[in-house]
């Protein structure tokens, strides 16, 4: 028994000892930290099956796919995102029981971690030509590959020899258009957004510009309808820089009206409102000797936020505001209050009041 114990101890000392608790962290055994974490694969790769039973993509790259011990029947890659990921060369794949290539699944979340499970060795491989490149983007993969360019890659794997070298797997320059497909999609989306913004700017332009376009189209009946659109520069702003309009404020109690003129400059943000004349009883027609005073105030909604107020009794006066954006002018309103400044009991009598929105007036 003593001899058997010595033999057993010598055999155990000659074999490499494995730690009893491999999942316990000690100062001498701390794994390298990565984001996202690189977890070990719970199964080891088996020997590669014959190339005749493999699809063309897996046979061309035998080192990029791993066959798991459990090929779940519920695994599916029919969604568009998985189909697009299958066309990328650096993602690991697994062979299903039916002979198809599928993406590997994460062992701890049971999700397709197509970007996190790739090993550094497989990620360093250059992209190889594959016929399903058109599933990821619109460019690339339209022209079929020549059989001569595909034979040197598939021949070593079919004969059971060593895996092809990196120089052999290097694709021709025309097959690298797959990596530039997202840039084309982004460029197309930006161009579509720019065209929508230009169409919106044309829709909110003033009516004077639309009348000018109609006059130009009527002046040249022989010219095609697309000629005015193509003659405009794409960088030119179709909206006018200065907007001018006139409006009438009706005084409800007195039955009269006040005529206002508004002018807005887009470049400087300057708004100018001028009270032109008073019509009806507010203009002094009923009582010629009684002076009329108009109190004008700019009101920003919500009501009560008074920006500027004028108490002068002069009708033709200019009220200016600087540094206003289009959104502020769109919400701005002119509130006019007319009162009689006569003598005795008639003094301070309210003749009427009204309000005029500047946004619809200036077509903003």
Swiss-Prot record:
Mention any one GO cellular component term assigned to this protein in its UniProt record. nucleus
Q: What exactly does this protein do?
A: May be involved in inflammatory process. May regulate cell architecture and adhesion.
InterPro entries with a match to the protein in the record: C2_Ca-dependent_4, C2_dom
Query: What family is this?
Result: Belongs to the C2CD4 family.
Where is composition skewed (Polar residues) in this entry?
A: 220-233
Where in or outside the cell is it found? Answer: Nucleus
Residues in C2 domain copies: 254-364
Question: What is the protein name given in its UniProt record?
Answer: C2 calcium-dependent domain-containing protein 4A
This protein's UniProt keywords: Nucleus
Q: Where are the annotated segments for Disordered? A: 118-175, 192-242
Which top-level group of life is the source organism from?
Eukaryota
């Amino acid at each position: 028994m003593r001899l058997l114990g010595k033999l057993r101890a010598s055999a155990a000392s000659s074999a490499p000892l494995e730690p009893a608790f491999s999942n316990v962290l000690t100062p001498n055994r701390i794994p390298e930290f990565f984001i996202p974490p690189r977890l070990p694969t719970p199964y080891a790769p088996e020997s590669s099956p014959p190339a005749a039973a493999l699809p063309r993509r897996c046979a061309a790259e035998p080192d990029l796919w791993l066959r798991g011990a459990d090929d779940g029947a519920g695994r599916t890659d029919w969604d568009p995102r998985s189909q697009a990921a299958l066309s990328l060369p650096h993602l690991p794949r697994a062979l299903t029981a039916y002979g198809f290539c599928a993406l590997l699944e994460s062992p701890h979340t049971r999700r397709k971690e197509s970007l996190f499970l790739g090993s550094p060795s497989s990620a360093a491989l250059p992209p190889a030509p594959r016929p399903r490149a058109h599933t990821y983007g619109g460019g690339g993969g339209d022209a079929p590959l020549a059989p001569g360019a595909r034979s040197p890659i598939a021949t070593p794997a079919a004969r059971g020899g060593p895996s092809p070298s990196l120089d052999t797997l290097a694709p021709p320059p025309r097959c690298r258009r797959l990596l530039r497909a997202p840039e084309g999609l982004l460029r197309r989306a930006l161009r579509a957004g720019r065209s929508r913004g230009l169409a919106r700017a044309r829709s909110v332009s003033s009516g004077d510009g639309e009348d000018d376009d109609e006059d130009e189209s009527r002046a040249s009946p022989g010219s095609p309808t697309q000629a005015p659109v193509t003659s405009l520069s794409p960088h030119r702003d179709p909206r006018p820089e200065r907007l001018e309009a006139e409006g009438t404020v009706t005084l409800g109690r007195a039955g009269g009206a006040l005529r206002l003129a508004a002018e807005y400059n887009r470049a400087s943000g300057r708004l100018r409102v001028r009270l032109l004349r008073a019509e009806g009883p507010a203009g002094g027609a009923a009582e010629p000797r009684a002076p009329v005073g108009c109190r004008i105030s700019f009101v920003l909604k919500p009501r009560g936020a008074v920006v500027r107020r004028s108490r002068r009794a002069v009708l033709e006066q200019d009220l200016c505001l600087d540094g206003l954006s289009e959104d502020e002018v769109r919400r701005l309103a002119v509130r006019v209050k007319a009162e009689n400044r006569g003598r005795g009991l008639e003094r301070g009598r309210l003749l009427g009041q009204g309000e005029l929105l500047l946004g619809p007036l200036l077509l903003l």
